[in-house]
């Protein structure tokens, strides 16, 4: 079986022992994004080969707790939450620009900036050579213009010899929309956004209710027996599953 990770919205793809594809942001772009974030008191994290480093606020927001909170807040509260959020981040001491400049000595594949949806246009106008996508309404994922998760998967296809039509992908956020629309089977998670569900081939259960396992079972790829038990005819799949159960 194939064993790889497509990270940073398709900008850094690796196996357990080698990098298959990497597309770093220009140093000048990263530097100017840091300056912009510092000027506007916006927390920022830089995506390197060792992980997303920089902002503690962003680390909290990308944690399971942060994702849970963002999904249980009613949409009708969006404006109120946005105002409160802007007020909150103004109270934080700006990050050290020197620390961020030290981090950017390494290749940076993605920048994550604390910014509401309403601020997207201003950032895009300031930085026309980047693409902004989102997995949260409170942070912006910034990668090179013209790039995406789908293009990252296409690069994998060139390496391993498969077509996008042969791919099944799962998603729950805005930054998954192009990917789910472009692969053979796009599966929207039950906890995902409505627009994603409208475009998906199939809508499964939530991530907390074995949504991925249920979708794989729906398409006959595994045998989903109970909420906590499923197997596959692929021995490699079963070994990976057993390993994750052990680690959990």
Where are these regions (language model features)?
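Mg2+-dependent phosphoryl-transfer enzymes with acidic/Ser/Thr/Gly-rich catalytic loops
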Residues: 125, 140-248
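Short, polar loop motifs at secondary-structure junctions
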Residues: 10, 115-119, 190-194
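Short hydrophobic/aromatic-enriched beta-strand-loop microsegments
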Residues: 2-8, 131-136, 186-190, 204-206
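Catalytic cores of large soluble enzymes that bind and process phosphate-bearing ligands
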Residues: 25, 112, 204
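Active-site phosphate-binding/coordination module
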Residues: 1-71, 248
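Short glycine-enriched loop/turn motifs at secondary-structure junctions
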Residues: 14-17, 104-107, 135-136, 181, ...
């Amino acid at each position: 079986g194939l064993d790889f990770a497509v990270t940073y919205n398709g900008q850094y793809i690796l196996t357990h022992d080698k990098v298959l594809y990497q597309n770093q942001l220009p140093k000048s772009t990263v530097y100017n994004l840091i300056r912009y974030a510092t000027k506007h008191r916006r927390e920022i994290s830089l995506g390197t080969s060792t992980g997303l480093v920089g902002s503690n606020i962003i680390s909290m927001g990308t944690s399971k707790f942060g994702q849970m909170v963002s999904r249980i807040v009613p949409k009708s509260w969006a404006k109120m939450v946005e105002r409160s959020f802007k007020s909150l981040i103004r109270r934080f001491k700006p990050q050290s620009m020197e620390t961020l400049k030290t981090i950017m000595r390494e290749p940076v594949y993605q920048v994550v900036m604390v910014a509401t949806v309403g601020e997207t246009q201003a950032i895009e106008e300031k930085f026309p050579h980047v693409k902004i996508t989102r997995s949260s309404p409170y942070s912006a994922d910034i990668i090179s213009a013209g790039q995406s998760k789908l293009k990252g998967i296409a690069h994998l296809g060139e390496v391993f010899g498969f077509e996008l039509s042969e791919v099944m992908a799962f998603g729950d956020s805005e930054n998954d929309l192009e990917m789910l629309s472009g692969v053979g089977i796009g599966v929207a998670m039950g906890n995902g956004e409505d627009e994603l569900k409208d475009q998906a081939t199939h809508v499964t259960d939530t991530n907390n209710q074995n949504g991925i396992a249920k979708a794989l079972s729906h398409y006959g790829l595994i045998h989903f027996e109970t909420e906590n038990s499923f197997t596959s005819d692929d021995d490699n799949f079963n070994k990976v599953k057993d390993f994750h159960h052990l680690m959990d």
